[in-house]
C-alpha cells in the first residue's frame, strides 16, 4: 500500500494534504512514515500544482465512518487460502484522514468491535474472501470501512503484501505457514 502517503483531503472548509510540492514537482520525504498533514484550505495554487503533475490521480468520495468509543476505525481482514484468519481493527481520532498504523492509528484487539458489529461479521468475511478469490490470490489483507448510520461494509483496498499484526495479537505468519503446509500440491 501507500502507507498513507500522497493523500489530499478536501471537504468544505477543511483541505489537508500530506503531499509536498517544490517547484511544481512532487517532493519525497526522507522517510517512509509520518507524512504529516498540513492545512491547505482554499489554497487553489496547491490544487493547480497537483493537477499539473500529470500523474494519475484517484478521486474518491468520503464514506462517513461508523464510530466505536468515539473513534473512527477500519478493519484489516486477513484471508489465506479462502479462509478468514483474523480481523484487525485500526482506530484513530474522528477527524483523522487515514487509519495506517505508521501514520498514527492504533491497532486494537478484535474485542474492540464485538457487540457493535456482530451482525456484519458474516458479510465482512464473505466480501473479503470473495475479493481475494477474484484476484486469484492465496493471501491478502482486505481493508474494510463500516459506514455510519447503515453499518454497511465497504472494501477500501486489497493488499497482496499486507503488514502483519504483532504476534501477541494474532500470529498471522504462523497461520499462513500452517495453511501452506496444509495444501495439497500437485
Language model regions located:
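A short linear hydrophobic-aromatic micro-motif
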Residues: 58, 140-142
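Phosphate-binding site of ATP-dependent enzymes
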Residues: 1-100
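C-terminal active-site "lid" helix and adjoining low-complexity regulatory extension at the edge
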Residues: 100-139, 146-186
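Short glycine-enriched loops at secondary-structure junctions
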Residues: 90-94, 145, 150
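Glycine-centered flexibility sites
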Residues: 4-6, 104, 141
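Short, surface-exposed charged micro-motifs
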Residues: 76, 143-145
Amino acid at each position: 500500500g501507500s502507507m498513507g502517503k500522497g493523500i489530499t483531503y478536501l471537504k468544505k472548509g477543511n483541505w489537508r494534504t500530506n503531499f509536498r510540492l517544490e517547484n511544481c514537482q512532487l517532493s519525497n520525504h526522507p522517510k517512509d512514515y509520518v507524512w504529516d498533514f498540513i492545512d491547505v484550505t482554499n489554497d487553489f495554487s496547491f490544487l493547480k500544482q497537483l493537477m499539473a503533475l500529470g500523474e494519475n490521480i484517484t478521486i474518491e468520495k468520503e464514506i462517513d465512518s461508523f464510530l466505536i468509543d468515539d473513534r473512527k476505525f477500519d478493519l484489516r481482514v486477513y484471508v489465506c487460502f479462502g479462509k478468514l484468519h483474523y480481523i484487525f481493527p485500526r482506530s484513530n481520532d474522528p477527524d483523522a484522514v487515514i487509519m495506517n498504523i505508521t501514520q498514527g492509528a492504533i491497532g486494537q484487539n478484535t474485542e474492540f468491535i464485538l457487540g457493535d458489529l456482530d451482525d456484519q461479521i458474516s458479510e465482512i468475511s464473505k466480501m473479503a474472501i470473495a475479493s481475494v478469490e477474484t484476484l486469484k490470490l492465496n493471501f491478502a489483507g482486505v481493508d474494510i470501512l463500516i459506514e455510519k448510520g447503515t453499518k454497511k461494509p465497504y472494501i477500501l483496498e486489497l493488499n497482496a503484501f499486507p503488514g502483519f499484526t504483532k504476534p501477541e495479537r494474532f500470529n498471522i505468519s504462523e497461520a499462513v505457514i500452517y495453511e501452506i503446509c496444509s495444501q495439497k500440491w500437485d
